[in-house]
A protein has these predicted regions:
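Enriched for short, Lys/Arg-rich terminal
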Residues: 2-5, 9-13, 17, 50-84
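N-terminal first-folded block
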Residues: 6-37
Length: 84
């Protein structure tokens, strides 16, 4: 699991409890893969992209290319600025 530089930068602006949830999500992505239906408002955005809410105001978006082991978290930030 890889966090892009822009996602890491936005994550630093999150409240501590939300950052802890992001770390938990990253751990679960590492263990279980890109499908995370137990997370709040989880949905598949496209064939290879997914998102969930870390809290009411904060979301994470990630992608996993077919036949790839890499999961890239490309957005972790406010819901208002989410790229979907």
């Amino acid at each position: 699991v890889e966090l892009t530089k822009s996602a890491a930068k936005k994550a630093r602006q999150m409240p501590k409890s939300t950052r802890q949830d992001l770390v938990l999500l990253l751990e679960e992505l590492e263990k279980e893969g890109p499908m995370q239906p137990e997370w709040s408002n989880y949905s598949k955005l496209s064939k290879n992209e997914y998102h969930c809410h870390l809290s009411y105001s904060w979301v994470a978006c990630w992608r996993n290319e077919k036949n790839s082991l890499l999961i890239e978290v490309y957005y972790a930030g406010s819901r208002e600025n989410a790229p979907y």
